[in-house]
From Swiss-Prot:
Region (Disordered): 81-179, 1082-1106
GO molecular function: dynein complex binding; dynein intermediate chain binding; microtubule binding
Domain of life the protein comes from: Eukaryota
Cell location: Cytoplasm; Cytoplasm, Cytoskeleton
Modified residues (Phosphoserine): 85, 110, 114, 117, 121, 183, 1117
Gene name for this UniProt entry: DCTN1-p150
Name by which UniProt lists this protein: Dynactin subunit 1
Biased composition range(s): Low complexity: 103-138, 161-177
Native species: Drosophila melanogaster
This protein's GO CC annotations: aster; axon; axon cytoplasm; centrosome; cytoplasm; dynactin complex; dynein complex; kinetochore
Family annotation (Pfam families): CAP_GLY, Dynactin
Length: 1265
């Protein structure tokens, strides 16, 4: 009965058991596939109480519940209300799903625990990174000599990070402060270090040498020079003291550098120790995971064993249920068999009545023909046939009208949908035009803004940017190094997450494989059920046809007997038969309606299956769907199996359509068509069995060959599809009842030749042969050929004129009869001795003998063709003679038949023709001997064949033999996995390439920057060169002027020297005169009164002359008129000396000032600022919140599962984590606060406007604003 009528609460009756009950459950169950109905019986004759295998479906008393199929129930009373049928059990969980859920819960628990451990490791990594940065920043910066005017100038870049002194580097407070400063430094406020200055030796003071022949003015100048040298020595001592202080500071810096190197070495050692600890932790983690996996595998094995035991118990219960169902089914079938036997007996009685009536009719018709009377009109039987045809035509007309109305309705519906789609398209086009207009406006606005931005950026700003870019890049390098360290930590966390996800993926794949296996089992059961349903439908169709025929005969009998009312009244059994016929007809009509509904449902299933296949093929790559690919290979296998199935249909329908002939007489040959139809059936079956032989071998080969051979076979799909149309044509002829003896078999012969050639071409390199199936097909083909040849020989016997028994044609026909009978007996014997198991492949025969049997079938096919052509031409000749001469006999001379047979042998055998007798006798003698050998071998080796087949099947089950389709599928899966791996590798390579491109771009930018610097340096060099040339010209002019003045002074000096020389000469002459006078005075001995005043002068003169004659000459030789000139010259020399000394001191001071300005300014430690500390702590919290927002994953499944979770881990997991949007807004606000604080502390870094202050370009780049 229909499953739609079965609802909970309905009253039903169990067919065949006379039990009443109430429906309590309708739906799917876990103990068997399909829909079951739970019935609460009125009597305690059930089998359960509503529960099976620990699962409660409904409640009732003990032994009052029973589960049956919907087809075993008959509805007595519908449900009182519209209660919904229970489609699935929601309160109980099947035991089969418990291991899977346990495995999922354990995997999820391990995943959550691994994530918690990863969060802890991530916190440790961030802490270590902050400590690393703190240790690097805790080293005190180098001190440098600040210039004297440092109060008026400000340093171009300062660091916000405060270095702790080296002496206090061990206490905890300093390390905590340094870690805070290090976390604050990570934002990019770094100071760019300048190269240190190593002062050179001080310049020596120039030496000044006096000429040896200078006068008193030179002595004064020497004194001044000594005085200046003393001053210079004092300055030199001051500078040496400063140099010593600088050297002392540099020595202190070197000691600090040594301490820094020591700390760096310790840091590297700690890093190595940390890596070793991390490696040991990773190995321990892996061992822990391995141990967990082993424990999980053991638990799964235990659960699987328990599940298997539960499945065994379920199977036992199912077997008992199936046994009971089989017993019930056997009872019903026994009842149906008895009713069918009674019906057959009744129909046999009716058939005998009809035969007697037809014989009487035939005798009356023969009497009318012999009497020369005209044939009467249409009989009642023919009239009834015409009425039935009219009724069928009317029904067809009504169906066509319904179909046309349905098509019109569909066309109107599609037209309405088309109009709706057009209106939607117009609306979308309007929306597109509006959006395109908006896009154009926005692009114009963007272009204007871009032009404004380009106009705002000037050349000077670009030069400044390029000049300062190196400093910014150094800052960025430091930032990037810190980011790289953080990313390496994140990479480690990511690798651990990937490992945990990989384990989860393996678990899910195992579950997916189990689900796919269950799905395949369900599909196999569904296919078996569909095959069973199809076989039953075929049987029902045959019975319906038989019932229809018998109904027609009964209606005819009813019409004939209606005229005789008295006899009908006297025979009450006929009335009973009529009533039963009417009841059966009504039952057949109801069955026909049910069949129509089933056909519609199957049509829906077929359309959905086709759509499913189309959707699945849409996911396949182009290589799968390409010509000669895997898709074509699958289609080839399906095509060959489909052609084999169609051949079976042709065989069965042809045997039913053309029954065998009881006796072949001359009247049956010349006046009827039954003999020719039977011969045609035999030939057709021979070719169909030959086609099946080739197809079976190709199908076996394609299921056992290499994948390359299968792909090669896929390329021949179009040719095979064309050959399939030949078989489809034969089936169409069978459907239209147009297949008869006049139909040609040339196409099927070409099809057989094509597939034999394809078998030899495709499977030539591989020895793949299904021997048993080939023998079975060849036996069927030989049997049909023998039947055809025997029918042709029988026709030849009755149409050849009787003559002597020694003629060639008669002898050949007798020989053919005897040998064909022998071959047919041998074929039947081989067929009986073949194993019934279809999975048996090997027969123990050599390949040469098996191929010889196929050749034997082909050779007998040639004999069959020759005999058929000769018989056909003979009948045509007889018909032509009858048409020309009605009095001629329906026979043919032996000589003419022999000539026709010889001509047909020449056409068929061509070059191998040796005459009919020779052709047939040699072949049939060899055929008998070969078939006897094969039959004897099958009889002797029957046990060996079966045992070898069993061994092969066991080996096949244990060896996991896979078909080429499975191998190709596994290969494609591996290729997809490799493709995914390659895609991941390619993505990594692309990321590396992008990084390299970024690095190359940075290098290109640096190169362009260096090029610009080079151009600027060349420009400055050219400017300096011009200035130098201009200065050289100036100095040349000054040199020439000075040289002219020197020449003039030399001339004046020479003149003065000449004048002085004349004065000296005059003084010498005067001196000599005075000496002469002095001598004269001494000789006279007279001393004058004024001589005492002059004597000291003379003494001093003599002393002077004795000590330093040169000086006395210079001192006392000058007259009174030359003293102003000498004093003026001395004054000029003093002025020149003072100017030169001042210029030299000024240049030395400038040089020292320039050298001191190149030194790095000393860092003055500032007291701790509360605002900076607050900003650092806020920044640290922001970083931790951002990292937690990236790694926090809340797993609801793990919470719902029954695993134990630590309270602290649960509290941390349930701790609220802010969203990324909130963190981003807070981060932007914090950045603006930091920038504001920085600009307040460093106002020179800001550009002041009328309304606000903005950071400069370098600050923007450092902060990445």
């Amino acid at each position: 009965m229909s499953e739609k009528n079965l609802k909970v609460g309905a009253r039903v009756e169990l067919t065949g058991k006379d039990l009443l009950g109430t429906v309590a459950y309708v739906g799917m169950t876990s103990f068997a596939v399909g829909k079951w109905v739970g019935v609460v019986l009125d009597e305690p004759k059930g089998k359960n109480s509503g529960s099976i295998k620990g699962q409660q479906y409904f409640q009732c008393d003990e032994n009052c519940g029973m589960f049956v199929r919907p087809t075993q129930l008959r509805l007595l009373e519908a449900a009182p209300g519209s209660r919904r049928s229970i489609e699935d059990v929601s309160g109980a969980t099947p035991t089969a799903a418990q291991p899977t859920k346990a495995r999922l819960s354990s995997s999820r628990t391990s995943l959550s625990s691994s994530r918690q451990s990863l969060l802890g490791s991530r916190t440790q990594l961030t802490t270590s990174l902050s400590e690393r940065t703190a240790s690097s920043s805790s080293i005190g910066p180098r001190k440098s000599l600040a210039p004297q005017n440092s109060k008026d100038k400000e340093s171009p870049s300062t660091s916000l990070a405060e270095g702790a002194p080296a002496a206090s580097g061990g206490n905890g407070a300093a390390s905590h402060a340094s870690s805070k400063r290090a976390s604050f430094v990570e934002t990019g406020f770094l100071e760019i270090l300048k190269p240190q200055f190593t002062p050179s030796q001080p310049l020596r003071s120039p030496s000044f040498t006096m000429p040896s022949n200078s006068g008193a003015e030179d002595k004064v100048a020497l004194l001044e020079a000594q005085k200046t040298s003393a001053e210079l020595q004092a300055q030199l001592a001051d500078l040496t003291e400063k140099l010593e202080t600088l050297k002392q500071r540099r020595n202190e810096d070197k000691e600090r550098l040594r301490e820094f190197d020591k700390m760096k070495i310790q840091f590297e050692q700690l890093q190595e120790f940390r890596t070793k600890i991390m490696g040991a932790q990773a190995s321990l983690q892996k061992e822990l995971l391995r141990a967990k996996q082993e424990a999980k595998d053991a638990i799964e094995a235990k659960e699987q064993h328990a599940q298997e035991m539960a499945d065994l118990a379920d199977n036992v219960e199912m077997i008992t249920l199936d046994k009971e169902m089989a017993e019930e089914k056997a009872d019903t079938l026994q009842l149906e068999l008895e009713s069918s036997k009674e019906r057959i007996e009744e129909l046999e009685v009716d058939l005998e009545l009809l035969r007697s009536e037809m014989q009487n009719k035939a005798e009356s018709a023969i009497g009318n023909i012999s009497g020369g009377g005209d044939s009467p009109g249409l009989s009642t039987y023919e009239f009834k046939q015409l009425e039935q045809q009219n009724i069928r035509l009317k029904e067809t007309l009504v169906r066509l009208r319904d179909l046309s109305a349905h098509d019109k309705h569909d066309i109107q519906k599609l037209s309405k949908e088309l109009e709706m789609k057009r209106s939607e398209v117009t609306e979308l086009e309007r929306t597109k035009e509006k959006l395109s207009a908006k896009i154009d406006e926005l692009e114009a606005i963007v272009a204007d803004l871009q032009e404004q931005v380009d106009a705002a950026l000037g050349a000077e700003e670009m030069v400044e940017q390029l000049a300062e870019k190196k400093m910014e890049l150094e800052d960025k390098v430091k930032l990037l190094e810190e980011e790289i360290a953080q990313l390496e930590a994140l990479e480690e966390v990511h690798e651990q997450l990937v490992e945990s996800n990989h384990e989860l993926e393996l678990d899910l794949r195992e579950e997916l494989d189990l689900a796919n296996g269950a799905k395949k089992e369900v599909l196999r059961e569904r296919d078996a059920a569909i095959e069973t349903i199809y076989d039953r439908d075929q049987t029902i169709v045959k019975f319906r046809e038989l019932v229809q025929k018998l109904n027609d005969q009964l209606t005819e009998l009813r019409d004939r007997n209606s005229s005789n009312e008295k006899e009908s009244l006297q025979d009450p059994s006929l009335k009973m038969v009529t009533e039963t016929i009417d009841y059966k007809q009504m039952f057949a009509e109801s069955k026909a309606y049910t069949r129509a509904i089933d056909v519609q449902l199957r049509q829906i299933e077929l359309s959905q299956a086709n759509e499913h296949v189309q959707m699945l093929t849409a996911f396949m790559p182009e290589s799968f769907m390409s010509r000669g690919g895997d898709h074509d290979s699958i289609l080839v296998i399906l095509l060959i199996s489909r052609i084999v199935f169609k051949c079976d249909i042709v065989v069965s329908q042809t045997r039913e359509r053309f029954p065998p002939v009881d006796a072949i007489t001359r009247e049956a040959v010349t006046q009827g068509h039954a003999v020719q139809q039977y011969a045609f059936k035999c030939r057709l079956l021979h070719y169909v069995h030959s086609l099946q032989c080739a197809l079976h071998q190709i199908l076996y080969g394609l299921n056992s060959c290499q994948p390359d051979t299968l792909l090669r076979a896929g390329s021949s799909l179009p040719e095979m599809v064309a050959q399939e149309k030949i078989v489809d044509g034969i089936i169409e002829l069978l459907k239209s009842n147009q297949l008869d003896e006049n139909s040609t078999t040339d196409n099927i012969e070409k099809c057989v030749a094509f597939f034999n050639a394809m078998n030899s071409v495709l499977l030539a390199g591989e020895q793949l042969l299904n021997e048993i199936q080939m023998i079975r097909d060849c036996v069927a083909s030989l049997g049909a050929a023998c039947e055809s040849i025997l029918s042709d020989t029988a026709i030849a016997k009755v149409i050849i004129q009787e003559a002597g028994a020694t003629s060639d044609s008669v002898l050949l026909i007798q020989f053919l009869n005897e040998n064909m009978e022998s071959v047919r007996q041998q074929v039947k014997l081989i067929k009986r001795r073949l194993p019934s198991d279809q999975h048996v492949i090997k027969s123990g025969l050599s390949q040469h003998k098996v191929e010889a049997m196929r050749g034997l079938a082909q050779n007998i096919s040639r004999i069959m063709s020759a005999m058929h052509q000769a018989t056909k031409q003979s009948l045509a000749a007889i018909v032509s003679t009858i048409e020309s001469d009605n009095a001629a006999e329906h026979t043919l001379p032996q000589e003419k038949y022999w000539a026709l047979l010889t001509a047909s042998c020449e056409r068929i055998y061509e070059q191998d023709d040796r005459g009919p007798t020779q052709n047939f006798k040699t072949l049939l003698a060899q055929a008998n001997s070969d078939l006897q050998l094969i039959a004897q071998h099958l009889l002797d080796k029957e046990y060996d064949i079966i045992s070898a087949a069993n061994n092969a099947s066991n080996q096949q089950k244990s060896g996991a033999h896979s078909t080429p389709i499975t191998q190709r599928a596994q290969l494609i899966k591996k290729q997809l996995e490799q493709k995914n791996v390659l895609a991941a590798t390619l993505e990594n390579r692309e990321a590396d390439v992008k990084q390299l491109k970024v690095a190359a771009k940075m290098k290109q930018n640096e190169l362009s920057e260096m090029q610009i610097r080079k151009d600027l340096a060349e420009k400055k060099l050219s400017v300096l060169q011009n200035e130098y040339e201009h200065a050289v010209d100036k100095w040349k002019q000054k040199y020439e002027e000075t040289s002219l003045q020197l020449q003039l002074k030399e001339k004046e000096f020479e003149e003065t020297m000449d004048h002085l020389q004349s004065d000296i000469d005059a003084l010498e002459s005067e001196k000599s005169d005075l000496r002469d006078k002095l001598k004269l005075n001494s000789t006279t001995g007279k001393v004058q009164p004024g001589s005492e005043s002059h004597s000291p002068h003379n003494i001093s003169l003599s002393g002077n002359t004795s000590t330093a004659p040169g000086i006395s000459n210079v001192s006392y030789s000058a007259p009174a008129g030359t003293a102003p000139v000498v004093a003026e010259e001395v004054e000029l020399l003093k002025n020149a000396f003072n100017q030169e000394r001042n210029q030299r001191l000024r240049l030395q001071a400038q040089d020292m000032r320039a050298k001191l300005s190149q030194f790095e300014p000393l860092h003055v430690p500032q007291p701790q600022d509360q605002r900076i500390t607050a900003l650092e702590s806020e920044l640290t919290r922001m970083k931790h919140a951002w990292v937690l927002s990236l790694l926090q994953v809340r797993s609801q499944d793990s919470v719902n599962s029954g695993t134990r979770i630590d309270a602290v881990a649960l509290q941390r997991r349930n701790q609220p984590v802010p969203l990324k949007g909130e963190i981003s807004s807070k981060a932007s606000q914090l950045a603006s606060d930091i920038l504001t604080e920085y600009l307040q502390r460093k106002p020179h870094r800001a550009t002041h406007g009328q309304f606000a202050s903005f950071p400069t370009v370098d600050v923007k780049r450092v902060l990445q604003i």
